[in-house]
């Protein structure tokens, strides 16, 4: 969402962001799940999920994602009427409904209590493996990073300090 001071972002061999190129977010073919889930409070969960630019074309995929995340009974409710874990799953469905090449997740489990976090972590791993989607997760929780990811990258002050495959 920002113009970088240095470096570049390349997605499928196309520069989408550097000091001189700034592709608008809606044209990047990537989606984002924010730390606070950023569901629209005045929309039902169903309306939130169908808000994305590709949602009208991905009806069958959305139905499958709703089933995978077990939120079908929540569709008529508003975000403030459901738990944090349920909001997280709804935000995930909304992002995945756009069928992005890249999914960005900012601290996706940080707002959840430990029991709910473990359950949502298992669900997230299952869904992402089934969809075979590339996901970049920002987290300060080493257990989340090691459990969810196929590869981990450690950055310090914007510099790569470690790249590894969790065991």
What are these language model-derived features?
Residues 97-101:
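A short, proline-enriched helix->beta-strand linker immediately N-terminal to the Walker B motif
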Residues 16-31:
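ABC ATPase NBD coupling module
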Residues 103-107:
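Catalytic Walker B motif of ABC-type/P-loop ATPase nucleotide-binding domains
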Residues 14, 57-76, 125-132:
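Conserved ABC ATPase "signature" region
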Residues 163-164:
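ABC ATPase "signature
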Residues 78-82, 86-88:
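Conserved ABC ATPase signature
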């Amino acid at each position: 969402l920002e113009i970088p001071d240095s470096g570049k972002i390349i997605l499928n061999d196309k520069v989408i962001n550097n000091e001189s190129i700034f592709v608008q977010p809606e044209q990047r073919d990537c989606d984002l799940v924010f730390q606070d889930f950023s569901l629209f409070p005045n929309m039902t969960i169903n309306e939130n999920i169908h808000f994305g630019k590709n949602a009208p074309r991905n009806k069958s995929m959305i139905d499958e994602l709703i089933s995978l995340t077990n939120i079908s009974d929540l569709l008529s409710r508003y975000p403030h009427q459901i738990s944090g874990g349920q909001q997280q799953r709804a935000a995930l469905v909304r992002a995945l409904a756009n069928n992005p090449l890249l999914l960005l997740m900012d601290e996706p489990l940080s707002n959840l209590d430990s029991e709910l976090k473990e359950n949502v972590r298992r669900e997230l791993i299952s869904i992402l493996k089934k969809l075979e989607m590339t996901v970049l997760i920002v987290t300060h929780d080493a257990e989340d990073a090691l459990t969810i990811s196929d590869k981990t990258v450690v950055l310090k002050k914007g510099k790569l300090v470690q790249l590894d495959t969790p065991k």
